[in-house]
């Protein structure tokens, strides 16, 4: 069911979330110009022409939710509605992904975050989704799906299970058939699927992100402390023994990669199959459908190797009937087009078009 409508997508990161990375968020005029021009109808038409069937739109809770008033903010909602209307015009389905909200701390797995522990922030999280359900109640469930949160970090291992189920109950007060995605702990790790408490709801699906191993997909990432230190070029397929040695010598980085261990000696399709076996088991044993909301390779990786990795991942996902959305369409270091709407990774675009056929 899910795979039929959300098979091959691409992310619109940088539009309504992480916009501060691509524009001056301190200038109201500049920010308005960004929202008006970063994603246009022409961009959506292009995405459709490339053969994608959906987009994932990250939205920022700081931008969209007025905590004092307990309501969604009009202007950001207007930008989102406009984009969704363009998508409908070109036959593109939509995932609305709550990418960030007050109280969340990305990757914080040592201490419970305020989002997990504060009653006020937990209430706000659930109220955000209640308001979204109210706003989009009449929209076709097969055309628009809610993703409860982007990459959750819950040091307790159980508070997220409680919070996400509560958010679903709020949505169901308004819309009993809206399709909903609930992601795994530890920044949507595929290895944490077995720690999700599942709900008895035919319209709730589960999702993960896949960038394994990060040393390949994020190599030389300027935004990563780890990969500003470890700068060794990584191939696919490629040897990983030196990187595993590095992790063993840097415990604060080691704990950020729970799926990597001393036996992870080679970055290849076999490793990918091993890690995705958790997804395969989840689908087979739970009877629930899965979706991968993000995957991709940074633009500093060797192009030929990035092509091999992407081909292997998409092929494996398709064989498991797991829909997927590549990160990212525009800007943010993983892009297909740049800020000027010029294609900057033509080889990867050509591969995606081939895989989309």
PLM region descriptions:
Residues 301-357:
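Aromatic-rich peripheral "rim/lid" segments of glycoside hydrolase catalytic domains that contact
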Residues 13-39, 68-72, 110, 114-119, ...:
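Acidic/histidine-rich helix-loop elements
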Residues 34-55, 65, 69-100, 107-145, ...:
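An active-site-proximal structural segment forming one wall of the substrate-binding cleft
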Residues 33-38, 63-65, 71-74, 152-158, ...:
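Acidic-and-aromatic substrate-binding clefts and catalytic sites of carbohydrate-active enzymes
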């Amino acid at each position: 069911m899910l795979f039929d409508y959300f098979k091959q997508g691409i992310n619109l990161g940088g539009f309504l979330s992480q916009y501060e990375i691509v524009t001056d968020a301190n200038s109201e005029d500049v920010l308005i110009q960004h929202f008006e021009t970063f994603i246009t109808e022409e961009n959506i038409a292009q995405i459709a022409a490339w053969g994608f069937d959906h987009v994932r739109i990250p939205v920022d809770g700081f931008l969209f939710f007025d905590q004092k008033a307990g309501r969604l903010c009009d202007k950001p909602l207007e930008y989102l509605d406009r984009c969704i209307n363009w998508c409908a015009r070109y036959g593109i389905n939509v995932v609305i992904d709550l990418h960030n909200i007050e109280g969340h701390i990305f990757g914080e797995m040592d201490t419970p975050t305020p989002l997990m522990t504060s009653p006020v922030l937990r209430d706000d999280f659930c109220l955000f989704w209640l308001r979204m359900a109210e706003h989009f109640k009449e929209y076709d469930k097969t055309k628009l799906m809610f993703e409860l949160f982007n990459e959750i970090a819950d040091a307790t291992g159980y508070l997220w299970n409680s919070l996400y189920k509560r958010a679903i109950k709020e949505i169901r007060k308004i819309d009993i058939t809206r399709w909903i995605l609930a992601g795994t702990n530890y920044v949507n790790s595929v290895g944490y699927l077995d720690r999700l408490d599942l709900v008895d709801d035919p319209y709730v699906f589960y999702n993960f992100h896949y960038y394994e191993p990060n040393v390949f997909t994020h190599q030389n990432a300027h935004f990563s402390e780890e990969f500003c230190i470890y700068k060794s070029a990584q191939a696919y397929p490629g040897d990983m023994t030196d990187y595993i040695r590095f992790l063993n010598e840097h415990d604060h980085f080691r704990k950020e990669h729970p799926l990597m261990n001393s036996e992870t000696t080679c970055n290849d399709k076999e490793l990918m199959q091993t890690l995705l076996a958790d997804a395969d088991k989840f689908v087979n044993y739970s009877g629930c459908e899965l979706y991968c909301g993000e995957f991709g390779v940074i633009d500093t990786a060797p192009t030929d190797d990035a092509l091999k990795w992407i081909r292997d991942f998409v092929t494996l996902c398709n064989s498991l009937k797991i829909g997927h959305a590549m990160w990212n369409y525009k800007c943010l270091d993983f892009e297909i087009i740049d800020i000027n709407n010029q294609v900057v990774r033509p080889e990867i675009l050509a591969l995606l078009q081939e895989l989309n056929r």
